[in-house]
């Protein structure tokens, strides 16, 4: 009689103890370490502003100094972006006024996931600082951009000059039209779109249609001081400027059908046999 009893057991746990991850969202990899489940150690990347221009000095002793910051990552702009946050200008002559410092703020950054391209920031605020009074803001310029899609990126929708509390002095508003266009030889066909442009294959034309300048000067509502309206040659042409209307009475309107002070009509000539177009005729 022979008996050979036996038993076997094993137990194993696998987990990473070291990895490279962007923990703080600054666009650079950090070192992440963990020797036990209750502890996590992060060594942050120190690259930051490395190799970004810091200052320039001219032959007369004047300098300008740049500073940078990383924007907060958002759904629209994952990972954020390194941007210029401040500019200090010193002309080297200190008896003619204080050093000038300008700070910059960026909002509504957009990265198009489909195009894999950065479309810009929806709002950029340029702040003039009082360097003799604790760097307090005394004036700011606000610029708004259309970052809705690839075709409209970079179009300025509004600009304004404001005081430190956001009360406007002046404002400019822009309105654009949107067209899909198709080409038949040298002739284009334009199809107007009133919604966001979106296509993998189509070409688009997004011209400036209307501009209004407003004056506030402390009031809650602005007064229109001037307007401009543009019309373009479309089907059968190439989107050339056709006419321009101007009014300083505030009566023109976004459709261009109101009263105006003067209008300019533009005509072009071409040499179609040689595919040469858009020569200004009058």
Where does each model-flagged region fall?
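Non-catalytic interaction/targeting regions
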Residues: 1-282
């Amino acid at each position: 009689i022979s008996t050979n009893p036996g038993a076997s057991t094993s137990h194993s746990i696998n987990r990473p103890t070291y990895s490279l991850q962007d923990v703080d969202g600054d666009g650079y990899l950090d070192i992440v370490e963990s020797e036990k489940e209750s502890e996590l150690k992060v060594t942050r990347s120190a690259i930051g502003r490395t190799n970004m221009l810091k200052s320039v000095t001219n032959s007369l002793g004047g300098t300008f100094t740049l500073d940078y910051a990383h924007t907060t990552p958002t759904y629209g702009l994952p990972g954020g972006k390194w941007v210029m946050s401040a500019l200090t200008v010193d002309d080297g002559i200190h008896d003619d006024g204080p050093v000038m410092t300008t700070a910059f703020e960026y909002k509504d950054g957009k990265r198009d996931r489909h195009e894999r391209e950065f479309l810009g920031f929806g709002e950029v605020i340029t702040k003039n600082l009082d360097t003799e009074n604790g760097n307090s803001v005394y004036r700011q310029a606000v610029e708004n951009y259309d970052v809705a899609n690839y075709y409209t990126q970079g179009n300025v929708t509004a600009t304004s000059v404001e005081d430190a509390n956001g009360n406007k002095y002046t404002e400019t508003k822009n309105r654009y039209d949107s067209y899909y266009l198709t080409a038949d030889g040298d002739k284009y066909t334009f199809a107007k779109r009133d919604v966001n442009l979106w296509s993998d294959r189509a070409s688009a034309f997004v011209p400036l249609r209307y501009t209004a300048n407003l004056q506030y000067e402390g009031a809650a509502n602005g007064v229109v001081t001037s307007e401009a309206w543009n019309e373009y040659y479309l089907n059968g042409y190439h989107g050339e400027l056709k006419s321009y209307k101007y009014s300083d009475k505030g009566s023109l309107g976004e459709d261009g059908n109101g009263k105006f002070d003067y209008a300019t009509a533009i005509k072009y000539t071409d040499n179609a046999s040689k595919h040469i177009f858009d020569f200004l005729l009058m």
